[in-house]
Amino acid sequence: MAIVKCKPTSPGRRFVVKVVNQELHKGAPHAPLLEKKSKSGGRNNNGRITTRHIGGGHKQHYRLVDFRRNDKDGIAATVERIEYDPNRTAHIALLLYADGERRYIIAPKGVSAGDQLIAGALAPIKPGNALQLRNIPVGSTVHGIELKPGKGAQIARSAGASAQLIAREGVYVTLRLRSGEMRKVLAECRATLGEVSNSEHSLRSLGKAGAKRWRGVRPTVRGVAMNPVDHPHGGGEGRTSGGRHPVSPWGFPTKGAKTRGNKRTDKMIVRRRK
């Protein structure tokens, strides 16, 4: 990984900071593991905008990533290559299993082409191997953590993400997440050892608005720049500050208001995030 600052040969290049990884595969992705990905422009079946700031962008294919890793226990796999994935911040690794099947997984940090990986209860403790949490030593760093056994990884999947296994008690283990939250998870759930690759992703700078448009992100208009019919902060003679505490276009408090409402899983949280 290398952080590259572009020379200011044009206004659009002046602030560009790239993360360059020479190990990334330069060819096409593995075709059998691709699926069509259609664009909605943020509209639903009625043609109405349900998610703002979506539209345009380069055409993409979805890579089918194996988040479960539960039906290849004991079958060794060789990392064929590490690839870029436009659908996520992390890189993905193409595995070739001993039975001849190929699958994508989230690429762990430090894993490169030619490495051997395996999943299952007897897998050695090394980055990239997937085990049940009850078989992972206390103090280990893990990612791709399930919340329900067999459902597939849900926690710590983005670039540089990880959690630390800090305790094991009965049928539960306790994890410390990057947010500072400490949470109980069933020991039957699976996780992958190590942290997610591409941890330098947060250091990049796109440099210009057009680079966001290439990614399918449209501009965000401030509420105070709108008319009263469009936003609670809109209207007024001349420039105004909105005249009230910040709210969304639908009048709900924003900028710090708590939105968590899942009381059913409150019992699994040992300590709230910072």
UniProtKB/Swiss-Prot annotation:
Subunit organization: Part of the 50S ribosomal subunit. Forms a bridge to the 30S subunit in the 70S ribosome.
Family: Belongs to the universal ribosomal protein uL2 family.
Protein's UniProt name: Large ribosomal subunit protein uL2
Keywords linked to the UniProt accession: Ribonucleoprotein, Ribosomal protein, RNA-binding, rRNA-binding
Disulfide bonds: none
Originating gene: rplB
Species annotation: Pseudomonas fluorescens (strain Pf0-1)
Pfam families referenced in this protein's UniProt entry, alphabetically: Ribosomal_L2 (PF00181), Ribosomal_L2_C (PF03947)
Gene Ontology annotations of biological process type: cytoplasmic translation
GO cellular component: large ribosomal subunit
Stored PROSITE patterns: RIBOSOMAL_L2
Region feature Disordered, mapped onto this chain: 28-54, 224-274
GO molecular function: rRNA binding; structural constituent of ribosome; transferase activity
Biased composition (Basic and acidic residues): 263-274
Job description of the protein: One of the primary rRNA binding proteins. Required for association of the 30S and 50S subunits to form the 70S ribosome, for tRNA binding and peptide bond formation. It has been suggested to have peptidyltransferase activity; this is somewhat controversial. Makes several contacts with the 16S rRNA in the 70S ribosome.
